[in-house]
Amino acid sequence: MKRRSLLASLCVLPLASCQGESATVRFKVIASATVNGRPIESSSVMEITYSKVTHSLLGTGGATRLCGEALIFDLDGRGTVYILPVQHPPESSLSQVYEYGMLTTLGVKNGIGSLTEQDFATLRGANGRHSFRLYGTARLPSFVAFNDERDPKTIFEIPPPELDRYFPGVRFKSLDIQITNEPLTEKLRERLPWLKNANDPNIFPRDPRATRRPNSELPLSHMITPARFFGDGSR
């Protein structure tokens, strides 16, 4: 699989001549939980464009563009969780999640860099609501919350199965993808005003430069940046 950033840097021809077939999927991310047994849902509309790159120094490959923002999951007065458009695999850096997860959720077996005509047709013809699946794993996008939403340094990560540990009475149920034509959600910058002009990653906790741990040892709070709250097409 070839990363968009790598391909963009290697395409020496104009963008139009670098791209071949493409497909855009607009979808609603739906988070479901129960609060003292009562079901609740929150959602956010996002969009991914998949493109085949036909002229690059590496030959044929693929590119993606994700538009949208973190899902604001209000827990019926118990607090709020933000579901980021990235994942945090164990002992690793933050990485793309919906770009890969959409493919496996819809049953596309090929990777971003090797999509076929049939794969693009599957993406263009997608419909309905599906349980989110990232490969054959139970991994989900990263869930974060704040001790004080006005202070980004109070961010912390929450394993989805442990929601009730942080918000008593709340149990996470599922994350679904529903194909839609609704407008993209744009609520996050109003909810977290410090994101409007935040370009400095140091608004979040950071190790001192002289003693910085490797990414494999860092908690999410110490590697996240403001851009990670948005897809690369919405930053």
Indicate residue ranges for each PLM-predicted region:
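Hydrophobic helical h-region of N-terminal Sec-dependent signal peptides
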Residues: 8-12
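C-terminal motif of bacterial Sec signal peptides marking the signal peptidase cleavage site
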Residues: 16-17
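N-terminal export leaders
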Residues: 2-7
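Structured domain cores in non-transmembrane regions
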Residues: 38-155
